[in-house]
Amino acid sequence: MGRLQLVVLGLTCCWAVASAAKLGAVYTEGGFVEGVNKKLGLLGDSVDIFKGIPFAAPTKALENPQPHPGWQGTLKAKNFKKRCLQATITQDSTYGDEDCLYLNIWVPQGRKQVSRDLPVMIWIYGGAFLMGSGHGANFLNNYLYDGEEIATRGNVIVVTFNYRVGPLGFLSTGDANLPGNYGLRDQHMAIAWVKRNIAAFGGDPNNITLFGESAGGASVSLQTLSPYNKGLIRRAISQSGVALSPWVIQKNPLFWAKKVAEKVGCPVGDAARMAQCLKVTDPRALTLAYKVPLAGLEYPMLHYVGFVPVIDGDFIPADPINLYANAADIDYIAGTNNMDGHIFASIDMPAINKGNKKVTEEDFYKLVSEFTITKGLRGAKTTFDVYTESWAQDPSQENKKKTVVDFETDVLFLVPTEIALAQHRANAKSAKTYAYLFSHPSRMPVYPKWVGADHADDIQYVFGKPFATPTGYRPQDRTVSKAMIAYWTNFAKTGDPNMGDSAVPTHWEPYTTENSGYLEITKKMGSSSMKRSLRTNFLRYWTLTYLALPTVTDQEATPVPPTGDSEATPVPPTGDSETAPVPPTGDSGAPPVPPTGDSGAPPVPPTGDSGAPPVPPTGDSGAPPVPPTGDSGAPPVPPTGDSGAPPVPPTGDSGAPPVPPTGDSGAPPVPPTGDAGPPPVPPTGDSGAPPVPPTGDSGAPPVTPTGDSETAPVPPTGDSGAPPVPPTGDSEAAPVPPTDDSKEAQMPAVIRF
């Protein structure tokens, strides 16, 4: 190439870069914002990045979020804001801030003109409702939830945001004094803000997709079911977490509220006085009053975590199983990782990852019995027999350890996700349903070689980390990442993961109740990647056989869960509690065997006892359930008025601060008032405690942290006194949490199926 040609090429490239499209200052309902335009190469493509745009006013402790008043001049949106207040990994100090409700936006730009009408993808981070942030952990100066790779490779707008977590986000008395769900309402405020303002950034406000993982995936699910989001969401993706997961809904919030109140010195005898005291308590003290034990647990971690969403009769008007008609027009993808339960199994049973340690029958039986408390001895025996059937033919430690992981994967993630998919499909009108299983093995070097895809391993591939930080990844990792970004962004554009601007490795068929089809995501995908009936025999066991077992009384129940005082040793099972539970031997009463026959047939959704696995709606499922609404009889009304229209830039004197849109669109619907009294108190059955995700994106080779790995979960506090007693009697009658001294409060039984 001659010198003249090189000069011409150089000038052409410089002209392309100089003339690349960019947004500049953007007008929002709060005022003008200006981000950064990042060049992506010599051809002129770029991405506009806005960090730290407020979507709500600074928070007040244990109160709903409020609209932001706006600002004067142009807001420089160039740096991530602090996360919401939460405990550090040592749980002896806090970081973050109460003023934390900010969002971040990535907008891909071409060479000629700024983008218009792009699909919008809003990410909700996980972290057990205890920790996390909208930008995630930092790895090689690249944050986990940096949206650049998704935005530029998929040609979509990506939005991430902060929401309140831990006691400040989810503490509730179970009534109107402290209704809870503040973190969910923060999420809703962010979604509504995007709906009203994203057109100014080049997005299509009528094509919004939510996606999230773990507690974020469950949050996505809950947001689609809430009547507050009617008309705001077009599509949704739940990764390793749905509203029906046993760790999502707290059925005994008063118990946990009292534990925190005792720690900070607030009265617990009267809910109103307790609530007033908690609201004026130092938010840092509230955060540190709740600690999760991370080692030496006597019971599964599921028992120790308490600050999660509640059924408040308003934002979540009823049990999520009865709200799927609200998502009838929302396209939905849901799936799990093939060893989602590994990190939790390794905490509950540390021998899992230790080659010189063995898992015994007694160990596994004890674990099973602690997950099946409400079904007593028979529930423990039948479940143990079903899961250990292969041990006679293969008694190896690898097989036994895999069994423990499969058990926790099924209970915590896979079974509830399969039920959620069936519910969505059964209620869907125009919406499509898709299922997946992520099976690309974990990169964690300290794990045994048999470990598959652990909890949160999928996040790094969705966010394109193999491209953003290529030195830590292999070509096969980039293959997986490319496929996931293609499927996810195609789905955001069209509602079909196969159709869009990105080529996919194989066709992903929709999920139906007849075929139970799912796509297995691996490094090498083809026609054989589309499979049927994932772990059907185990799914049928939980939704049919186990469900049919009688619920036991408190005297018959096996282990008593811990009381919440992480400093005290949990009380072991009663009865012959001096010895560890012994697995059944010989013919233990011929426990029921999981249904056989045509295993390819989809499992029958559970019915009957509502205390057990979620039950699909019966009768006219097309009619959405009406939430309790005072004496009005009408469901909450989503934002109306001018909420669908983008804010109009000010005219005349531009020096005056812009005025946000008027009307009620900026705030969430106001709960009805009247003489109806406080919303119903949730039952005490299921603790809904979320598992704690792995920590991690630390500098070692690409193991994705669960969101905000820099912090650790935070749990039960206070001396509870006597050990709590599992729910008693007929599970169809939801027990009401005690309202007197919390030392008499019941500890929820964590599993319903």
From Swiss-Prot:
Activated by bile salts such as sodium taurocholate. Changing H455Q: Abolishes lipase activity. Decreases Vmax for esterase activity by 2.5-fold. Residues 21-121 are annotated as: Heparin-binding. GO terms for cellular component: cytoplasm; extracellular exosome; extracellular region; extracellular space; membrane. Keywords: Diabetes mellitus, Disulfide bond, Glycoprotein, Hydrolase, Lipid degradation, Lipid metabolism, Repeat, Secreted, Serine esterase, Signal. Its EC number is 3.1.1.13, 3.1.1.3, 3.1.1.6. The keyword Signal applies. N- and O-glycosylated. Glycans are attached at N207, T558, T569, T579, T607, T618, T629, T640, T651, T662, T673. Its main location: secreted. InterPro entries: AB_hydrolase_fold (IPR029058), CarbesteraseB (IPR002018), Carboxylesterase_B_AS (IPR019826), Carboxylesterase_B_CS (IPR019819), Mucin-like (IPR032059), Neuroligin/BSAL (IPR051093). The keyword Secreted applies. Residues 559-745 are annotated as: 17 X 11 AA tandem repeats, glycodomain, O-linked (mucin type). It is found in: Secreted. One of its GO terms (molecular function) is catalytic activity. Residues 668-683 have a biased composition (Pro residues). It catalyses: a triacylglycerol + H2O = a diacylglycerol + a fatty acid + H(+); 1,2,3-tri-(9Z-octadecenoyl)-glycerol + H2O = di-(9Z)-octadecenoylglycerol + (9Z)-octadecenoate + H(+); 1,2,3-trioctanoylglycerol + H2O = dioctanoylglycerol + octanoate + H(+); a sterol ester + H2O = a sterol + a fatty acid + H(+). Sequence repeats lie at residues 559-569, 570-580, 581-591, 592-602, 603-613, 614-624, 625-635, 636-646, 647-657, 658-668, 669-679, 680-690, 691-701, 702-712, 713-723, 724-734, 735-745. Gene3D superfamilies: alpha/beta hydrolase. Mammary gland and pancreas. Detected in pancreatic and duodenal juice (at protein level). Expressed by eosinophils. Disulfide bonds join C84-C100, C266-C277. Interacts with CLC. Catalyzes the hydrolysis of a wide range of substrates including cholesteryl esters, phospholipids, lysophospholipids, di- and tri-acylglycerols, and fatty acid esters of hydroxy fatty acids (FAHFAs). Preferentially hydrolyzes FAHFAs with the ester bond further away from the carboxylate. Unsaturated FAHFAs are hydrolyzed more quickly than saturated FAHFAs. Has an essential role in the complete digestion of dietary lipids and their intestinal absorption, along with the absorption of fat-soluble vitamins. Belongs to the type-B carboxylesterase/lipase family. It is linked to Maturity-onset diabetes of the young 8 with exocrine dysfunction: An autosomal dominant form of diabetes characterized by a primary defect in insulin secretion, exocrine pancreatic dysfunction, altered pancreatic morphology, recurrent abdominal pain, and fecal elastase deficiency. Disease onset is at less than 25 years of age. This is Bile salt-activated lipase.
